[in-house]
Amino acid sequence: MTTKTITASALALLAAMPSAAGGSVATYTIQTDKPRQTVLHFGASDAWSMKYVGRWPEAEQRKVADWLFSTDCDEAGKPKGIGLSLWRFNIGAGSEEQGEASMIQPSTRTECMVGPDGKFNPAKQQAERQFLRLARERGVPHILAFLNSPPVYLTQNKLATNTGRGGTLNLGSDRYDDFAAFVTTAIEGLERYDSVTVDYISPLNEPDGHWNWLGPKQEGTPATNREVARVVRCLDNRLGKAGLQTKILVNESSDLRCLLGTHMTDWQRANELRALFSKDSTDTYVGRCRSVLPVIAGHSYWTNTPTDTMRNIRMRLRDAARRLGVDYWQTELCIMSNDVEIGGGGGYDFSMKTALYVARVIHHDMVYGN
C-alpha cells in the first residue's frame, strides 16, 4: 500500500485556547493507492463579469487572467494563479442590441455573435472572447460554451427572456434546425477568429428553472424534456455535418431535485436523468447521439442546507447516475438568496464564514456527488 504520512503540530492551535493541554501531535495517513473521487475539471464561468473585465486596461486583464488560469510560480515559488482547467463561456442571445426593449437589466444583457443572416460577426462579444484567448494563452485545456436562450430572432416572443410565456422552450417550432445551425456557426467562428476550440457545448442552461425565466434578471428559457431531446438531436446532426468534435452536455439543471424527480415544475421538466439517459424513455433518450457526453449536469443551488439533505441528495444522484452508466458534473455555483446561513447572498463578504460555506458545498459535491 502506498501511503503518505503528515504530522501536524497542534501547539499553535492550543496556544489560542484558554487552557492548553500540552503539545499534541496529529498524524494523518493518505492512502494514495485508494482514490475515492475522479476530478476531471476544475472551472469557472465568465457570465457576466468578463463583459466588463474584458474592457479593462490590458495589464489589468492579464493580471486577472493569471489569477484565474496560470499554473506557473513566481521567483519565490508562490503560485501565480489557481490554474483552472476549464473555462465556461456564455454564447449570447442578443439582448444587448435590443437595449431597454430587451426587458433585461443592463448588467446581464449579452450580444449575439451570429446574425439573422447566419454569419459570424467578429465584432460581437469581444470582451468575453478576450478572456477565452487569455485562457488559451495560459494553457487552459478545455472550453465549455453554454446558452441561456436561443438568439432573439429565433424565439417565439422575439426576446431573450421568457417573460409573457409559460414553461416551454422559447423557440419557434420550425426553428430547431436553425438554432442548431446558430450554435454550430458560433463554435466555428470562435475557432476561426480566436483559435479557440470549444470542447463542450451546453445548448440549454437550466431548462427546468421553476421561475420559468420570467422577469428582468437575465437571458433564459425553460424547456420540456422532449424539447431538450429535440434540440440535442438537431445539434448532434449539425455538429456531425460540420465535422466538429465538440461534445454536447445536458441538462445543466437548476436544482438537483429536478434530475431525480418532480420539483416545483410539472412532469415534463422532471426526472431528467431517466428521461434523457434511460433507454426506456424512447421519446427523450439521447444516449445514441454521437456527440452527447454520457454525463448529466446540474447546479449546486437550493440543496445546500441542511447538511444532511445536501449530502443525501448528492449520494442519491451519484448512485442513480451510476446505474445508468452516466457521470455527474457540477457546473455552476454562487451565493444565492436561500443561503441564509451567510446572510442571503446580498452584497460582498470576504470573510472566512462565506469561504467555508462555499468550501463545504464543493466538498459535498466532490465527496458525495463524485
Residue ranges and their predicted role:
Residues 1-9:
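Bacterial N-terminal signal peptides that target proteins for export
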Residues 8-16:
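Bacterial N-terminal signal peptides
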Residues 20-200, 209, 226-292, 322-326, ...:
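Non-catalytic accessory regions flanking glycosidase/transglycosidase catalytic cores in CAZymes
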Residues 169-170, 217-223:
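Glycine-rich tight-turn/loop motif centered on a GG-T
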Residues 204:
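Function-critical acidic carboxylates
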Residues 207-208, 254, 297, 301-302, ...:
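Catalytic metal-binding/acid-base residues of hydrolase active sites
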Residues 249, 295-299, 305:
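Short catalytic-loop micro-motif centered on adjacent basic/acidic residues
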Residues 300-370:
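Catalytic-core region of carbohydrate-active enzymes that cleave or remodel glycosidic bonds
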